[in-house]
UniProtKB/Swiss-Prot annotation:
SMART domains the record matches: Elp3 (SM00729)
Family: Belongs to the radical SAM superfamily. MoaA family.
Binding site for S-adenosyl-L-methionine: 31, 71, 122, 193
Assigned keywords, A-Z: 4Fe-4S, GTP-binding, Iron, Iron-sulfur, Lyase, Metal-binding, Molybdenum cofactor biosynthesis, Nucleotide-binding, S-adenosyl-L-methionine
Ligand binding (GTP): 18, 67, 98, 159, 263-265
UniProt-recorded name of the protein: GTP 3',8-cyclase
Catalytic activity: GTP + AH2 + S-adenosyl-L-methionine = (8S)-3',8-cyclo-7,8-dihydroguanosine 5'-triphosphate + 5'-deoxyadenosine + L-methionine + A + H(+)
Record keyword Membrane present: no
Binding annotation for [4Fe-4S] cluster 1: 25, 29, 32
Role, per record: Catalyzes the cyclization of GTP to (8S)-3',8-cyclo-7,8-dihydroguanosine 5'-triphosphate.
Binding site for [4Fe-4S] cluster 2: 258, 261, 275
Cofactor note: Binds 2 [4Fe-4S] clusters. Binds 1 [4Fe-4S] cluster coordinated with 3 cysteines and an exchangeable S-adenosyl-L-methionine and 1 [4Fe-4S] cluster coordinated with 3 cysteines and the GTP-derived substrate.
Superkingdom of origin organism: Bacteria
Length: 332
């Protein structure tokens, strides 16, 4: 008997779901949200049970990888229990989480026990003052303690996510690599994505391409192309000096990955986003609440939504913004 498969109209298989469990965060990163952010009312967001119901239907339809995101997922009460329920879904191969690391010193071990298979941890600077400037509220030492707690808990192939910005942290690229090598961490260097209008931050001035990142790395290390894949948008390389770790590049501007896109996103409001860089969406919360106890209705809405998935995004790296929602409203 063949496995169920979700397909879009371009015959791309969709088997990766990113789910935002909250729009709230204890950081205010300059590329993610405005400093004075207004968050969604509690009644407007999905309950943990509703998030689990959506995950259950996606896995029944062939999804093999789920990533929980935010905002910061670990500030939502009950998220460890949610992880345990999702990890137990028959057929799911990977349950991952993207986090800023601020809560991992106390939650890494419970997450590992709950069945989370991999962590991505955001880290854009190793300088405490610059880290504070970029996150507006973050404590670098607490994040590093969280990274060490993840290693101690048993997580492997933990990945650092670094958004590289010209004039802000591009000079730290090789220092971040050295930090990753020392702790046996993978790294993804990410081109900034133009989501939401942030008046105090110019994306045109801060854009730094993946090609520029590789040039900077080549000043200290030897990059070797790799065929590794984690079912996500990263294109991976290895380092001759540290072959055990993977170096990824997420390049939505300079080398977009739309042609092989295999993922969709669920916002915490229950909108199923078919593309990070477009507003095509389906309101799954409305389906859940209009037809409780009828999972077949939710499945049909998911299947039908695949036909709305566009071929590609329309990102630019000037200050023009095609998508007005912030990254924390999207699920990073």
């Amino acid at each position: 008997m063949s496995e169920p498969v979700l397909m879009d109209r371009f015959a791309r298989k969709v088997d990766y779901l990113r789910m935002s469990v909250t729009d709230r965060c204890d950081f205010r990163c300059v590329y993610c949200m405005a400093e004075e952010m207004t968050f969604l009312p509690r009644q407007q967001i999905l309950s943990l049970e509703e998030i689990h119901q959506v995950a259950e239907r996606f896995v029944a339809l062939g999804t093999r990888k789920i990533r929980l995101t935010g905002g910061e997922p670990l500030v939502r009460a009950g998220v460890v229990g949610l992880c345990e329920k999702i990890a137990a879904l028959p057929g799911l191969r990977e349950l991952c989480m993207t986090t800023n690391g601020s809560q991992l010193d106390k939650l890494a071990a419970p997450l590992f026990k709950a069945g989370v298979t991999r962590l991505n941890i955001s880290l854009d600077s190793l300088d405490p003052q610059r880290f504070r400037e970029l996150t507006r509220t973050g404590d670098l030492h607490k994040v590093i303690a969280g990274i060490d707690a993840a290693n101690a808990a048993g997580f492997v192939h933990t990945k650092l996510n670094c958004v590289v910005m010209h004039g802000r942290n591009d000079h730290e690229i090789n220092d971040l690599l050295a930090f990753a090598i020392d702790r046996n961490l993978d790294v993804s260097f990410i081109e900034e994505m133009p989501l939401g209008i942030i008046s105090e931050h110019s994306r045109a001035e801060s854009f730094y391409s993946s090609d520029q990142v590789r040039e900077r790395i080549a000043e200290r290390y030897t990059l070797i192309p790799s065929t590794d894949s984690t079912q996500g948008p990263s294109r991976y390389w290895r380092l001759a000096q540290a072959p055990g770790i993977r170096i990824g590049f997420i390049s939505p501007h300079s080398h977009n990955f739309c042609g092989t896109c295999n993922r969709v996103r669920l916002t915490v409001e229950g909108r199923l986003l078919l593309c990070l860089g477009n507003e095509h969406s389906v309101d799954l919360k409305a389906v859940l609440r209009a037809t409780p106890g009828q999972p077949e209705k939710l499945e049909k809405a998911i299947i039908d939504a695949m036909q709305l998935k566009p071929w590609s995004h329309n990102f630019t790296h000037d200050d023009g913004v095609q998508v007005v929602r912030f990254m924390n409203m999207t699920g990073g």
